[in-house]
Amino acid sequence: KTTITNYIRKHKNIPILDADNLSRELIKPNTYGYKKILDYFGNKIIDNKNNSEGIINRKLLRNIIFKNSESKEWIEKLLHPLIKEKMIEECSKYKNNQTIVLVIPLLFEAKFEDICTEIWLVKCPRELQKKRLITRDKISEKEAYDSINLQLSFEEKRKFSDIILDNSDDQNKWIDTIRELL
């Protein structure tokens, strides 16, 4: 997703909204999401290293929700509606644009399909996906697998997708497709 998003950002004049970036905004200190998370998890969720602002330790939060399905469900019930609302609000700023790219890693799991007019699914082998996650997020192999396993399978996602972009190895495959579509 990141490679394709970066390509669109560089070569097309199309707004891009990323659900992960919005979620980071929604849990910054003194926001509603931040306060709710602290109420639920307590101060143990605060990153104590070089952190005078009281920023939430996202890696610790991720580890907690991977190990505890109740916590995972709670955080999803809190954040998914907030992210969706924020994404709709941000989209309204671009109402004069014909196209807006929404990057939503858990599109189907969070039930965000209704805010999309067309769904593009980025395909890559699980092993490559795992490798990219480890490199990008600086997480362990187990954490990468846990993250991947939280998602619907590619086969399930494919059923609900309009376009499949293969980001396995040859960039020319998906670049040509994007040029045609945009």
Q: What is the role of each PLM region?
A:
Residues I14-I27:
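Short beta-strand-centered segment that lines the nucleotide-binding/catalytic pocket of NTP-utilizing
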Residues K86, K95, D114-I115, T135-L181:
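Small-molecule kinase domains that catalyze NTP-dependent phosphoryl transfer to phosphate-bearing small molecules
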Residues P15, N63, E118, D162-I163:
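Well-ordered beta-strand positions
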Residues R24-N96:
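ATP-dependent small-molecule kinase phosphotransfer cores
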Residues E85-Y94, T99-T135:
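ATP-dependent NMP and nucleoside kinases share a basic, alpha-helical "lid"
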Residues Y34-L38, R126-I134, E141, Y145:
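An amphipathic alpha-helix signature
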Residues T5-N6:
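The feature captures the helix immediately C-terminal to the Walker
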Residues K1-T2:
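Walker A/P-loop
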